Amino acid sequence: MGQLSILCLFVTVCASVCGYSWPSDETTTKPSQFKDFHTDPLVVETTSGLVRGYSKTVLGREVHVFTGIPFAKPPIEQLRFKKPVPIDPWHGILDATKQPNSCFQERYEYFPGFEGEEMWNPNTNISEDCLYLNIWVPQRLRIRHHADKPTIDRPKVPVLIWIYGGGYMSGTATLDVYDADIIAATSDVIVASMQYRLGSFGFLYLNRYFPRGSDETPGNMGLWDQILAIRWIKDNAAAFGGDPDLITLFGESAGGGSISIHLISPVTKGLVRRGIMQSGTMNAPWSYMSGERAEQIGKILIQDCGCNVSLLENSPRKVMDCMRAVDAKTISLQQWNSYSGILGFPSTPTIEGVLLPKHPMDMLAEGDYEDMEILLGSNHDEGTYFLLYDFIDFFEKDGPSFLQREKYHDIIDTIFKNMSRLERDAIVFQYTNWEHVHDGYLNQKMIGDVVGDYFFVCPTNNFAEVAADRGMKVFYYYFTHRTSTSLWGEWMGVIHGDEVEYVFGHPLNMSLQFNSRERELSLKIMQAFARFATTGKPVTDDVNWPLYTKDQPQYFIFNADKNGIGKGPRATACAFWNDFLPKLRDNSGSEEAPCVNTYLSKIRSSSNELLPPSTSLVLIWIMTLLNAL
């Protein structure tokens, strides 16, 4: 028997005995083809096996890209609805040059052919087999070929790990807008991203029906996917030239919500110490739910998928066997039956006693975070995007709509249907221009502010205040620039997600129609993020960007035409949501509350509605205080 045959036999036996899996010929090279991998700058030895990426030139600089690296076994069949299982090491060289699958989700097709919508839809094959990650490395970093050997070539650099948004129901790391080649080319950082399970595939929670310690439907599987990917990247950072102790998470919307959980959860605290949260924190109303609510949604899904929900108490495994036999498309469609209205997603992080042992703000308020730094922020018009989609009969994408006062009230009642009449009336009073009550265009602006403040800006402010109080070093930005070539109607302003293309450097792509000031803004944001990942501060000492505290809520303005420092943002509106409304809610159950409610309702039904907001809110304050006596 020849030496090559003996070698192949030996490797095969080792693979079977040690639990190694042989990838297909399509994804790996044969043993004889990788004997000289140490001389190949595009081959890296990871803890899972060898990977080969590809090289591209970006803005005159070379970037090495690795896409589609598996970090977990495919969560299919018996692994559906369970925590991710680490990938078995492979033999050969993995071809890391192809974009991975996107996790199962539904496409948004409200405006067919509209690029502003299509840019957020998955651009690769949709599959349950989706747990892969991507890495971008500046070529000037000498890639080493083993994760455990120290480098003698140059200092290791920070690693930025992107977590995409999409309300925990949609999104994919493969979107063009998330291509991190420009960040890698212009900043001395490595960038990575991962896929994680969405919707019921990532958040179904029915664990109470199984014995303690069971791995069945534990909830938050999508977050566990993220954790496994972060740990893989941390374990292999040095092999790519990165510093495993300088890892910063950054993400938008649900990505920001996820990051805030990883920073303070008892499971992941200490895994990373820096996070950048764009338009999303874990305390936002759309970013978490109770275990009881998650169970209720899970039962509805079981029934809608044709499985026997009555068996859950005594034969839960039979129920899950049935659910694992349901095709993915059916689950993906039926889960939306529990959508509860604007930003009322049926799958979110769940308070399940492990990753989220209690209410997010209780977790934050009870912790000590003096060794952590966070950078977070909001956009100027966070609410208009969601307002358009959920009330599409009321608004036009391309131009302003005259919102009748009656429809304004209808939208308030719909969004806040679970609040008392008194609370809803208070919202109307706070968000009314009393000098122009019947100006439909102002009503449209006000309702957009309601959505943006309640769901995004004010939860972000609240998180920042409490985090600072518990020792975190907090930096806040406010993105106020409307892109010169925005595809959305001008009335929508600076919408949710508008900052993402600047974060990833797309204005520096000269084939796109950005102006020179927007290119400068993008470069400034990338530099701020890279400096934050390196030093814990987003700017150099000669730039004024003060820390954010409750007493001094100062933020840095990101705008192509002006920069500066502001306070808030939206300080008055957020005082209403974060301070006043909870007090009103606490006292609305008293015997006198109906009197207040009746009085306010009479004012509300008045044809004039001319009480100024200061007067009306003072009346509510007085009556609330009287009720508390």
UniProtKB/Swiss-Prot annotation:
One of its GO terms (biological process) is acetylcholine catabolic process in synaptic cleft. This is Acetylcholinesterase. GO terms for molecular function: acetylcholinesterase activity. Glycans are attached at N125, N308, N418, N509. Homodimer; disulfide-linked. A lipid is attached at S605 (GPI-anchor amidated serine). Residues 1-38 form the signal peptide. Rapidly hydrolyzes choline released into the synapse. Belongs to the type-B carboxylesterase/lipase family. It is found in: Synapse; Cell membrane. The keyword Hydrolase applies. The keyword Signal applies. It is an enzyme of class 3 (hydrolase). Residues 606-629 form a propeptide. Keywords: Cell membrane, Disulfide bond, Glycoprotein, GPI-anchor, Hydrolase, Lipoprotein, Membrane, Neurotransmitter degradation, Serine esterase, Signal, Synapse. The active site is at S253 (acyl-ester intermediate), E382 (charge relay system), H496 (charge relay system). InterPro entries: AB_hydrolase_fold, AChE-related_enzymes, Acylcholinesterase_insect, CarbesteraseB, Carboxylesterase_B_AS, Carboxylesterase_B_CS, Cholinesterase. GO terms for cellular component: extracellular space; plasma membrane; side of membrane; synapse; synaptic cleft. Disulfide bonds join C103-C130, C307-C322, C458-C574. It is a lipid-anchor; GPI-anchor.
